């Protein structure tokens, strides 16, 4: 009878996003507090060191910073000099791009329609061949066997 569960408040798992954000904040605060206490301890001992990174992490961060610098510094040897384009030139280029993309879309639509049409004609032809009957009403076996052979050939390919 004393086994009743006590009221604990809001279930932390009802809103998972809120729970996760609280958990992340809690871990960040905990790490910051640990770091602060660590530096206080170092200061008391008289050692003034900057926080050291692992060799791998520092090498990666250096590589990233060098790549960032290289990518954002314009290199006059690799790039031709760009003169500012006026409005008419930019409009012309934009129009050409739009026309090119429109042509590509039209071509893909036409190709798709052609393939659909070919497949439907092929289906219709097969249907006609398979529905042929003898004089006595029995189905013709030749087209059916050919159909099965074609299916087997497709599976092999």
From Swiss-Prot:
Assigned keywords, A-Z: Coiled coil, Nucleus, rRNA processing
GO terms of biological process kind: rRNA processing
GO cellular component: nucleolus
Record's compositionally biased regions (Basic and acidic residues): 13-23, 63-75, 89-131
Coiled coil regions, renumbered to chain: 106-135
Ranges for region Disordered: 1-23, 44-157
Main location, first listed in the record: nucleus
Compartment(s): Nucleus, Nucleolus
Taxonomy, superkingdom: Eukaryota
UniProt key word RNA-binding: no
Similarity annotation: Belongs to the FYV7 family.
Physiological role: Involved in the processing of the 20S pre-rRNA.
Protein name per UniProt: rRNA-processing protein FYV7
Native source species: Debaryomyces hansenii (strain ATCC 36239 / CBS 767 / BCRC 21394 / JCM 1990 / NBRC 0083 / IGC 2968) (Yeast)
